[in-house]
């Protein structure tokens, strides 16, 4: 048999296998566009506007439909009712995490973000309990965030009102808050170890959320056999792992089991107490992966939201004026803002919620997976099937948020100007997989933004109407365009 004949037969077999697998599944799964062999629905999706593609498909096939990315079926949930029904009403069944090949290479099924089963449940339980023990929701962690906000203000003063790109400095503050929780100590913004750690973490988040990595995850052979940025992720994680293990070693040498100082201490104490069944959950490898997950989730997302918030506040100076008026009235100039102030600052609270709703940071959430065969709206979704929840369709629902494409803090205010909660506010996801650091992120956004606005006037380099708001969608995360501004001391 010559090479050409062999290749033709191999390709034909792959196409037939792909067709058979797709047809055998389609009778059970929700409807959707007809996929092509091997590549699935890739040609029917606008990769530059994936969210619009999902909206268009939902108009044809309804709020629950199936797409094929390669030969792999993806069930898409579009709209508040479908998302709520899955993540909240059937929370346990939809609490799985998709097996993402690149994440599997890094985490080996460990950590809190991409793990499943008992390992995920135990790690998440420990993480939430430890954050509470360290003062989440209390003055302890709040004081750390307030201290970091003041350090940020001092760094901004050093710009002396000159134009600057806020990207780096706004990344330092949330990263340092995580450092203080994990390692006990914060770092100077010029500390070499801190800068290198932040560089590696930020590079990995950007690469992992890039379109190329989404392609690699759908065609896993590319990871091992093709050059590309994914190799840098593995190299960066090797550095992060080595750095974290060195920190763990320092903690092991100075550990006082009666007086835990930080997240690592609590983990090491629990490790000593763990029985033989719990040993895997309390291994050093799981600690490293969990810390890496906390940094990735708690640094880039918060710093990007802060960066987007400043851009929106320059675009809408009337909103900024109302927020600063509220800060002057409630906080004044002689003390720093605290969390007790938030209940008396409804407009500021509404503005922060509207920033998160409007920017739609993670448009389609991290992919879920069903943990068992489930009948959902008369369809059968087999165990292990990937489920994508369109948070865009929830956060930009015109029934809940009139004119959803407009930035308007009034979306979260009632007729009397009081803050108004919304069940549609799912920026941190919902259900069993809701972000473990939601409370910390909310605290950081309020304290850092109010502290900046208490101390500075935000000056754009262009007229507000000329400020570019077109987001850069980097696969997983929506990023604001690059910009500069001046922080003018008040």
Swiss-Prot record:
Coiled coil: none
Main location: endoplasmic reticulum
GO cellular component: endoplasmic reticulum membrane
Keyword terms: Endoplasmic reticulum, Heme, Iron, Lipid metabolism, Membrane, Metal-binding, Microsome, Monooxygenase, Oxidoreductase, Signal
Domain of life of the source: Eukaryota
Tissue: Liver, brain, kidney, and intestine, with trace amounts in lung and heart.
Location of this chain's protein in the cell: Endoplasmic reticulum membrane; Microsome membrane
Top-level class of the enzyme under EC nomenclature: oxidoreductase
Signal peptide start-end: 1-20
GO MF terms, alphabetically ordered: arachidonate 11,12-epoxygenase activity; arachidonate 14,15-epoxygenase activity; heme binding; iron ion binding; oxidoreductase activity, acting on paired donors, with incorporation or reduction of molecular oxygen, reduced flavin or flavoprotein as one donor, and incorporation of one atom of oxygen
Cofactor: heme
One BP term from GO: arachidonate metabolic process
Pathway(s): Lipid metabolism; arachidonate metabolism
Reaction(s) this enzyme catalyzes, per UniProt: an organic molecule + reduced [NADPH--hemoprotein reductase] + O2 = an alcohol + oxidized [NADPH--hemoprotein reductase] + H2O + H(+); (5Z,8Z,11Z,14Z)-eicosatetraenoate + reduced [NADPH--hemoprotein reductase] + O2 = 11,12-epoxy-(5Z,8Z,14Z)-eicosatrienoate + oxidized [NADPH--hemoprotein reductase] + H2O + H(+)
InterPro entries: Cyt_P450, Cyt_P450_CS, Cyt_P450_E_grp-I, Cyt_P450_sf, Cytochrome_P450_fam2
Record: residues binding heme: 435
SUPFAM superfamilies for the chain: Cytochrome P450 (SSF48264)
Record bears the keyword Lipid metabolism: yes
EC number: 1.14.14.1
Spans through the membrane: none
Biological function: A cytochrome P450 monooxygenase that primarily catalyzes the epoxidation of 11,12 double bond of (5Z,8Z,11Z,14Z)-eicosatetraenoic acid (arachidonate) forming 11,12-epoxyeicosatrienoic acid (11,12-EET) regioisomer. Mechanistically, uses molecular oxygen inserting one oxygen atom into a substrate, and reducing the second into a water molecule, with two electrons provided by NADPH via cytochrome P450 reductase (CPR; NADPH--hemoprotein reductase).
Family classification: Belongs to the cytochrome P450 family.
Name this polypeptide is given: Cytochrome P450 2C38
Gene label: Cyp2c38
């Amino acid at each position: 048999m010559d090479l050409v004949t062999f290749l033709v037969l191999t390709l034909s077999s792959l196409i037939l296998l792909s067709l058979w697998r797709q047809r055998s599944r389609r009778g059970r799964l929700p409807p959707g566009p007809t996929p092509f062999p091997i590549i699935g629905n890739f040609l029917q999706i606008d990769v530059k506007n994936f969210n619009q593609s999902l909206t268009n498909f939902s108009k044809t096939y309804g709020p629950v439909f199936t797409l094929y990315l390669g030969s792999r079926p993806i069930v898409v949930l579009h709209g508040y009712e479908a998302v709520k029904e899955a993540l909240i009403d059937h929370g346990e069944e939809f609490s799985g995490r998709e097996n993402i090949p690149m994440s599997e290479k890094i985490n080996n099924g460990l950590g809190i973000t991409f793990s499943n089963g008992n390992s995920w449940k135990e790690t998440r339980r420990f993480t939430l309990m430890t954050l509470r023990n360290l003062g989440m929701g209390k003055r302890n962690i709040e004081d750390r965030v307030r201290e970091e906000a003041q350090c940020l203000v001092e760094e901004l003063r050093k710009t002396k009102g000159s134009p600057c790109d806020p990207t780096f400095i706004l990344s330092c503050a949330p990263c340092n808050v995580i450092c203080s929780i994990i390692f006990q100590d914060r770092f100077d913004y010029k500390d070499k170890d801190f800068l290198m750690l932040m560089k590696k973490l930020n590079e990995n988040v950007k690469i992992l959320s890039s379109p190329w990595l989404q392609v690699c995850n759908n065609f896993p052979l590319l990871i091992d056999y093709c050059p590309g940025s994914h190799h840098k992720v593995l190299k960066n994680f090797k550095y992060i792992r080595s750095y974290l293990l060195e920190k763990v070693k320092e903690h092991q040498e100075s550990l006082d089991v009666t007086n835990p100082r930080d997240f690592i201490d609590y983990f090491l104490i629990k490790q000593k107490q763990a029985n033989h069944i719990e040993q895997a959950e309390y291994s050093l490898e799981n600690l490293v992966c969990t810390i890496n997950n906390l940094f990735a989730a708690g640094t880039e997302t918060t710093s990007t939201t802060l960066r987007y918030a400043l851009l929106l506040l320059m675009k809408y100076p009337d909103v900024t004026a109302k927020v600063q008026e509220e800060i002057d009235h409630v906080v004044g100039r002689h003390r720093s803002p605290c969390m007790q102030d938030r209940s008396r600052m409804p407009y500021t609270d509404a503005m922060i919620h509207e920033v998160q709703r409007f920017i739609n940071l993670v448009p389609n959430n991290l992919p879920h997976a069903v943990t068992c065969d489930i009948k959902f709206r008369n369809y059968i979704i087999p165990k292990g099937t990937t489920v994508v929840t369109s948070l865009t369709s929830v956060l930009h629902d015109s029934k809940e948020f009139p004119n959803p494409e407009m930035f308007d803090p009034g979306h979260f205010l009632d007729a009397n100007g009081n803050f108004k909660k919304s069940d549609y506010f799912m920026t941190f996801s919902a259900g069993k997989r809701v972000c473990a650091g939601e409370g910390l992120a909310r605290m950081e956004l309020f304290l850092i933004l109010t502290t900046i606005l208490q101390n500075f006037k935000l000056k754009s380099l262009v007229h507000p109407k000329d400020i570019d708001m077109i987001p850069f969608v980097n696969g997983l995360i929506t990023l604001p365009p690059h910009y500069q501004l001046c922080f003018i001391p008040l």
